[in-house]
């Protein structure tokens, strides 16, 4: 009897583990989507920043 109960416990923990794994995979997918969106924003901001840096000497010369 005790052995059967233990086996059931193991099955339960396995299903919980797989559920946790699916949650982590879903989180990873969502986070990767967010990071790709943010990376687009970051690249855009970097390009704008670089453009302003390139325009900075002319701006300083004008002042």
UniProtKB/Swiss-Prot annotation:
* Record localization: Host cell inner membrane; Host cell outer membrane
Name the membrane topology term: Single-pass membrane protein
Keywords from UniProt, A to Z, are: Cytolysis, Host cell inner membrane, Host cell lysis by virus, Host cell membrane, Host cell outer membrane, Host membrane, Membrane, Transmembrane, Transmembrane helix, Viral release from host cell
Q: Does the keyword Acyltransferase apply?
A: no
UniProt KW NAD keyword: no
List, alphabetically, the InterPro entries matched. Answer: Phage_MS2_lysis
- Transmembrane ranges, per UniProt, are 21-43
Q: Name one GO biological process term.
A: killing of cells of another organism
Q: Which GO terms describe its cellular component?
A: host cell plasma membrane; membrane
Q: Which domain of life is it from?
A: Viruses
Fetch the Pfam families from UniProt.
Phage_MS2_lysis
Q: Which family does it belong to?
A: Belongs to the Leviviricetes lysis protein family.
Task of the protein: Induces the formation of specific membrane adhesion sites between the inner and outer membranes, apparently leading to host cell lysis. Lysis may be performed via activation of host murein hydrolases.
**Name of this protein:** Lysis protein
Organism listed in the record: Enterobacteria phage GA (Bacteriophage GA)
